[in-house]
């Protein structure tokens, strides 16, 4: 399947690479020519500007935007809406505010252009691990894009399905969800990010306390010299706080046990 990608930063570029590994054809553009040239050397078609990207694609076109939320994305959607034709699709894979998705989808629909919002989680590790995706939009368009989502998703791997899921959408177990209409994808991702930040803050607070358990401000008999790297490692193995975020914390502490945890409060 052919996909256009606008924005070739740390996530956009790796999304293209993962798609090309799966046999998809990618037409790419970034305002910085260097990442486009790098991807061209790997098999992508690097366009000189947005209009040339659109011209290089076959109808119906599917163009994924991976830009910072806000003005940059708004400007790009306005540009694309003047270049695309009825039946084409714009996919926003960034962290757009979900109410903006609803507004955009309504405006684009008047031109016959489809809009899909994709909350994308996986970061720079997604190239190898895959991306968890929370998707909002009309079902026929989501179904048309399924080969793209299936290639980007992590797949089932060795994670067992939760019991009692008989009859539910099996794509969820592969790592991507059609959450609902436009806005639903980014709404779910917004809540995901809030949970993530809370977990990160809890880890930071906990390890900060452990790191300073030998503070000279404590009575001598209450001081504890603790190895925070070893604590992180043991918690990875069977504890109820096991998580990928803990894995990343353990990796960072193993490389630098004196890592500055940061302020333990907000």
Where are the model-predicted features located?
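Helical "substrate-binding/catalytic lid" subdomain
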Residues: 130, 134-136, 144, 151, ...
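Beta-loop-alpha module in the N-terminal Rossmann-like domain of NAD(P)-dependent dehydrogenases
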Residues: 63-79, 97-100
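Rossmann-fold NAD(P)-binding glycine/threonine-rich loop
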Residues: 86-89, 93-143
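Hydrophobic residues in well-ordered beta-strands that form the structural core
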Residues: 28, 48, 65, 92, ...
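NAD(P)+-binding Rossmann beta1-loop-alpha1 motif at the extreme N-terminus of oxidoreductases
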Residues: 1-62, 87, 124-127
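Short glycine-/small-residue-rich Rossmann-like dinucleotide-binding loops
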Residues: 67-69, 95, 120, 153
